[in-house]
């Protein structure tokens, strides 16, 4: 008799996706981050659901409701810090996942890559709106500054900003709608993840060598299920350590002060995972130019498949491209550092240099070096 997992309509889908799926035998730990992102999403949805049961999205009570969760709700502090630091783990895994895609040329699977870019934007939007909800100083001023950027759009900008605010400033209407969208988006993200996996399973997974692995495949279960479980344990250990020993390490102390529209914090900055984009935004002295650079810093990922000039998919056999890749990583770390610094000399010029270098590496140097490597290999 055929196994039920191969005949049952629902189990059949799970079976072909996670059990009998043929996977390349050479996948390294860099291929763990997709499943880690799935766990992050599950943790965020679960902790977020329980937090939403006690949170009130009203300017008068939002800050106090978060305090109430931490002080009075059973294990509320665990939920709150798991959710806040879970977002950081989410972005660490997300950036490593994208970095893996860049290094090993996974962007050649264009549908999977493009859905991934949409997912990245959706997760960033969700995280931004979530940061506004505790209604601390940095929540309020972060929301004011970032939403105000839309006013740089010619002609419709001001109307658009007021439409998003639901008034003439960030206020109760803004907080309520941000809560509604923050609750809704993770479920849309979950649906998009299904689409992401659907497209991935159409082509099959890439592998570290960049060489087609059709002759050498192994079943996903038990090999990669156990490998993924090990990844889960390591990540959840790191998250638990962060939550239980140093929950405020990645947060901003200003957010423990209730929002006050009459008092601007000395340095308005987003959470650490947006600092690289924030540094690019600040490095251009023109509002519209800054906004375009900010959007392009992420949207440039969609252009990468178009500027792939190498005859090889992966960078594993291309040492010059590897040097450029790690230069890009160092550049992004520099931008992250600059984004958290005040706008003064020498940080301004460092930020501007790093921003130019970011676009230069991706749009000009990478394609040039790839073409040069083709000639060196006489291809």
From Swiss-Prot:
Its main location: mitochondrion. Keywords: Electron transport, Heme, Iron, Membrane, Metal-binding, Mitochondrion, Mitochondrion inner membrane, Respiratory chain, Transmembrane, Transmembrane helix, Transport, Ubiquinone. InterPro entries: Cyt_b/b6_C (IPR005798), Cyt_b/b6_C_sf (IPR036150), Cyt_b/b6_N (IPR005797), Cytb/b6-like_sf (IPR027387), Cytochrome_b (IPR030689), Cytochrome_b_C_euk/bac (IPR048260), Cytochrome_b_N_euk/bac (IPR048259), Di-haem_cyt_TM (IPR016174). It is a multi-pass membrane protein. One of its GO terms (cellular component) is mitochondrial inner membrane. Heme b b562 binds at residues 83, 182. The chain crosses the membrane at residues 33-53, 77-98, 113-133, 178-198, 226-246, 288-308, 320-340, 347-367. It is found in: Mitochondrion inner membrane. Its cofactor is heme b. Heme b b566 binds at residues 97, 196. Binds 2 heme b groups non-covalently. GO terms for biological process: mitochondrial electron transport, ubiquinol to cytochrome c. A ubiquinone binds at residue 201. GO terms for molecular function: metal ion binding; ubiquinol-cytochrome-c reductase activity. The cytochrome bc1 complex contains 11 subunits: 3 respiratory subunits (MT-CYB, CYC1 and UQCRFS1), 2 core proteins (UQCRC1 and UQCRC2) and 6 low-molecular weight proteins (UQCRH/QCR6, UQCRB/QCR7, UQCRQ/QCR8, UQCR10/QCR9, UQCR11/QCR10 and a cleavage product of UQCRFS1). This cytochrome bc1 complex then forms a dimer. Belongs to the cytochrome b family. Component of the ubiquinol-cytochrome c reductase complex (complex III or cytochrome b-c1 complex) that is part of the mitochondrial respiratory chain. The b-c1 complex mediates electron transfer from ubiquinol to cytochrome c. Contributes to the generation of a proton gradient across the mitochondrial membrane that is then used for ATP synthesis. PANTHER family: CYTOCHROME B. This is Cytochrome b. The lineage of its organism: Eukaryota, Metazoa, Chordata, Craniata, Vertebrata.
């Amino acid at each position: 008799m055929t196994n039920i997992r191969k005949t049952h309509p629902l189990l059949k889908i799970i079976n072909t996706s996670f059990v009998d799926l043929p996977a390349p035998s050479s996948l390294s730990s860099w291929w763990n981050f997709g499943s880690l992102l799935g766990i992050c999403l599950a943790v965020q949805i679960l902790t977020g659901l329980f937090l939403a049961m006690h949170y009130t999205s009203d300017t008068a009570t939002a800050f106090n409701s978060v305090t109430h969760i931490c002080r009075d709700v059973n294990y509320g502090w665990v939920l709150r810090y798991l959710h806040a630091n879970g977002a950081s783990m989410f972005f660490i895994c997300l950036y490593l996942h994208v970095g893996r895609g860049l290094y090993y040329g996974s962007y050649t699977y264009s549908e999977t890559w493009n859905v991934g870019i949409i997912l990245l934007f959706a997760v960033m939007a969700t995280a931004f709106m979530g940061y506004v909800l505790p209604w601390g100083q940095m929540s309020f001023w972060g929301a004011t500054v970032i939403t105000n950027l839309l006013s740089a759009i010619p002609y419709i900008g001001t109307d658009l900003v007021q439409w998003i605010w639901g008034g003439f400033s960030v206020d109760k209407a803004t907080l309520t709608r941000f809560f509604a969208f923050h609750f809704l988006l993770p479920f849309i993200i979950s649906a998009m993840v299904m689409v992401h996996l659907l497209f991935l399973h159409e082509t099959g997974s890439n592998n570290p060598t960049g060489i087609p692995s059709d002759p050498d495949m192994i079943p996903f279960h038990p090999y990669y299920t156990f490998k993924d479980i090990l990844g889960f344990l390591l990540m959840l250990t790191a998250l638990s350590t962060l939550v239980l020993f140093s929950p405020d390490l990645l947060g901003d102390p200003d957010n423990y002060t209730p929002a006050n529209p009459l008092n601007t914090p000395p340095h308005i900055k987003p959470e650490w995972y947006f600092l690289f984009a924030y540094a690019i935004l600040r490095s251009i002295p023109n509002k519209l130019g800054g906004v375009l650079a900010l959007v392009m810093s992420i949207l440039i990922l969609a252009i990468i498949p178009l500027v792939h000039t190498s005859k090889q998919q992966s960078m594993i056999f291309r040492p010059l491209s590897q040097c450029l890749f790690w230069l890009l990583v160092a550049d992004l770390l520099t931008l992250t550092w600059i984004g958290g610094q005040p706008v003064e000399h020498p940080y301004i010029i460092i930020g501007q240099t790093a921003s130019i270098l970011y676009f230069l590496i991706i749009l000009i140097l990478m394609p040039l070096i790839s073409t040069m490597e083709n000639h060196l290999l006489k291809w």
